[in-house]
Amino acid sequence: MSKLLARAKAKRFSAENSYHNMALDDAYIDECCFNLQQAIEFSLKYLVEMSGEQYVENHDIRAQMNKLKRLNAFIPSEDKLRLYASTINSWKVETRYNDKFVALIEDINEIRIIADELIKYCESLVRIE
């Protein structure tokens, strides 16, 4: 079985830890955003694998979502995820290589919810099998 769900959960846990330390240093904002992006990416790739297919070999969450749509698979929070896709995708690189990276707390809070809903849905699939 794939380690993608375990990785998604670990990244989400790391994001939450960084979230609670954001007031200490901007580095925690970077870490929070990067780990949220990773949690969502791994969750979507997990859903593709659970649909019996190989996920798209890139970091663009829209590519995973488009593949899931072609497979007629359910995507939790799909509308919100599409709305925030550009922001989430940018966090993969911006948080690591852009010293002037800035994230809106409102975006972080919405994306935390999206990540939680995705992981919760993925976990429900494990229990069904």
Locations of regions flagged by a protein language model:
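Terminal alpha-helical segments
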Residues: M1-E129
